[in-house]
Amino acid sequence: GSDSGQGYKICQKYNKTCKEKWFSDEQPVHKVKLDGYHLDIYEITQDEFKHAIGKDPSEFSGSHLPVENVTWFEAKKYCEHIGKRLPTEAEWERAARGKNNFVFWWGNKADSGKANFCDAQCEKRWKVSQLDDGFSYTAPVGSFPPNNYGLFDMAGNVYEWVSDWHDEGYYRNSPLENPQGPKSGRKKVMRGGSWINYPTGVRPADRTDSKPNARMDFVGFRCAL
């Protein structure tokens, strides 16, 4: 996790109606020890998904665009089909942070040259007009620089499903080694932010959730091993 005050401060810069409680599930800040693992360099593309599953549910069409509009169950099925799995939330965040502890993987200031979020080209009323990443919706995977682990789009483009159930207070009692998330729940965690978010949503610490059977044109995934 990270200081939820950071998220609140950034959100306030672009939206004065932000509330600090929106970021409470990022607390408390805690250290976690993880065994070794591998994470896909890119978000799963529409081509990859269609080749493996036989269909492409995406709202935005493009072979090198990330697949979106996929349920958590479909993401899990795809990863298992190719001999992998969805990453845990802890694995995902560790990889997203890169080799530092900044607010964003690249530093402490929002930068439209580093991630696809809702800025000048975005058609939502809450867009951040003073920044411009050049995309209105999803971007082809790898369009932005990788973090210092060599991973692309860990910030923005599409949210990514992870394996964990969401629990507002899980961080207060989570294991210090290889946490797997709560044993049950109603909603699954999504990480990384997307083309539809304020910059605050693309921080490595940001957490959100949705029902596992939900389909959204701003949610995709990548696999782990």
Residue ranges and their predicted role:
Residues 3-19, 58-208, 212-217:
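Functional-site microenvironments in short loops/helix caps that host divalent-cation chemistry
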Residues 1-55, 99-100, 189, 218-225:
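Short, compositionally biased
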